Amino acid sequence: MPVKEQGFSLLEVLIAMAISSVLLLGAARFLPALQRESLTSTRKLALEDEIWLRVFTVAKHLQRAGYCHGICTGEGLEIVGQGDCVIVQWDANSNGIWDREPVKESDQIGFRLKEHVLETLRGATSCEGKGWDKVTNPDAIIIDTFQVVRQDVSGFSPVLTVNMRAASKSEPQTVVNASYSVTGFNL
C-alpha cells in the first residue's frame, strides 16, 4: 500500500531557515540606520519649521511697516547696523497715530539678533537695552545670521528681505537657511 508523503523534508526546512536568518540579519543591520536617518530628517524638518515661522513673523511686521490711518510722524522702518536689528512702526489700531504708551499696546516692535538668539521687544525705540524677549530657544537653536535688507527701486515700493541662518545646538551640522521677501507698500 502506497504511503503519501506530505510536508517538507528536514533539508528543505534547514535551507529555508538559513535563508530567513540571512535576511533577518540584513534587516537588523539596516533598521538602526533607517531609524537614525528618520530621526535626523525629523529634527531638520522641525528646525526648518521653527526658522520659517520666525522669518514669516518678522516679514509680516515688515510688510505692515509705515501703515498709518492718519498723520503719523517718524519713520515706519528703521534698519540698524548690518540689518541685524530692525524697528517697525505701524498703526495697529487705526487711530491715526503711532502709539508709544502703554508699552503693551505700543505700535512699535523691534527684532534683533543678540548672542545667537532672535529677540523681540514691543515698544522698542532702539536696539540697545534690556527687556527684550527671546523668540528662539537658545538651548535648541543657534541663530548664526539674522538680517533685514531693504532694496529701493525707483518708482516702486521697497522690497524687504529677511535672511536667517540657524543650526541645531544638538547637531551643529544640521543647518537651515531661510530667505523671504515682502513689499513695503506703506514705506
Swiss-Prot record:
GO CC term (a single one): membrane
Pfam family membership, one: N_methyl
Propeptide boundaries: 1-7
Modified-residue entries (N-methylphenylalanine), positions: F8
Keyword Cell membrane appears in the UniProt entry: no
Membrane topology annotation: Single-pass membrane protein
UniProt-listed NCBIfam families: IV_pilin_GFxxxE, PRK10557.1
Name of the protein this chain belongs to: Prepilin peptidase-dependent protein B
